[in-house]
Amino acid sequence: MNRLAAACLAVLIAGPASAADLRAQVNDYRAAHEAAIIGQLDELVRLKSIAADSQGLAATGAYLESQLKTRGFDTASWSVGGSPPIVYGLLKSPGAKRTAIFYAHYDGQPITRAQWSSDPFVPVMRDGLAGKDLGWKAAKPPFNPEWRLFGRGAADDKSAIISFLAAFDALKALHRKPSVNIKVVWEGEEEASSAHLDGILKTHAAELQSDVWLIGDGPVHQSRTPTIYFGARGSLGLDATIYGPLRALHDGHYGNWVPNPAAMAAELITQMRDGEGRIIIPDFADDVRPLTDAERSAIARLPPVEGGLKKEFGIARTEGGESLTASTMRPSINIRGIRSGQVGAEANNAIPVDAVLSVDFRLVPGQTTPGLQDKVEAFLKAKGWTVVRETPDTVTRLAHPRIIKLNWGGGYPALRSDMTSPAAKGVIAAAQSAAGGPIAILPMMGGSVPINTFDELFHVPIIGLPIGNHDNNQHAANENMRLRNLWDGIALYAAMMAQLDW
């Protein structure tokens, strides 16, 4: 048999391979290229793509566009007003009847260097979450799947991009034609509230027509089971300042007489949420869309993780009296910070001049950000608060006993896609094929991703492909990516490219 005939036969054999065959072939490819794949993630993490570094964001966008070009994609870089570029890619697959858009973001959260065990932009491999540093480049594969690569963006969200690229490379090496036309949208402003995303998507709506959006963001279920999700909670931030005296006052001379803004803030918190974490603001949840039977069944099938997580987090109790996933289906109020007076060595016996509460609300389908703001402000006024937008002057202070300044941050609503649609069934089947068994199916991720924008503009199913480990320290110091999760991500993306159909 000549070489050309042998090559053609190899392609024919590879073409109709079963799901199990593809999974095994992709895993074999990955095993043979582990060092190169980790090297690609290492290289990407070294690019400083955080909001404070516009040059780093631009360089990262250019790097990623080049990665798509070398793989045969038609590419473009979309930006407006100096915003970080959105990297777009298109690869048509002959005969494909569906088009899937693969979304991820390449920007990361800001860093506080003193809190990191190592330079966040010089990736380090460790043998566990609190493990020792490893010289992985000198080690021989296969690498221990429990090893973790530490660095900003390693999990959120650069690992999704590398999984996509590695999966594409695997399919090309295996001569597997994608079952869908592939479009790529990689954003550089997600961690900064996606300020320009809506406008750019509207401008390029024609290029972004598809049958499904696949979102590469978020962690897998805490059981470490391969996971897909069908939505995400919305988000809305609020900074509230409560005012006390014009200057700090000696608490021996004026305590019990001059109102203490820190105590007022503590009282306000207990009026917004009870001891079980449930929101007690009147009418707050009136507009919430209930879960469907299919969504409730999906939650009931999830592996229990609560006992293990209590040990991992060092807590004796949980709030709400329900499973973790069930609790994330409800709206929530989180007190993300309180500032008032002094503590520790700087503590003094004084009544502080103000107290600042930083709050984030998580929304669920049915709620809107304007509607939530109206309900919160109506609640405050009913409790006797005078709501202001600017720092109050003396006249205002003397006229009103309880003054609170509200500074609402950016936000967006929640989304839950239909878990029973044909596209959903196709994604579930491909994900199960990649996993080689059952997967965790979440009606909605507890965290927030601005996927509502995609829904409002394009009206197609939006489904998440999370791959990060649940303990990846996303947004915090010592962010990390567990290798087993990276390997699972490559298998997942390969299945979405080669087997997705409906």
Language-model features: where?
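Acidic/histidine-rich catalytic neighborhood of metal-dependent amide-processing enzymes
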Residues: 145-231, 501
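N-terminal signal peptide c-region/cleavage motif recognized by signal peptidases
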Residues: 14-17
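A short core secondary-structure module
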Residues: 255-276
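Bacterial N-terminal signal peptides that target proteins for export
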Residues: 1-6
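An extended, acidic, His-containing surface patch that forms the Zn2+-binding/catalytic region
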Residues: 222, 280-354, 367-378, 383, ...
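A non-catalytic alpha/beta surface segment that caps or lines the substrate-entry region
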Residues: 40, 50-103, 118, 122
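Active-site metal-coordination/substrate-binding segment of hydrolases
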Residues: 97-183, 488
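N-terminal hydrophobic or amphipathic helices/low-complexity stretches enriched
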Residues: 19-56, 71, 114-115, 232
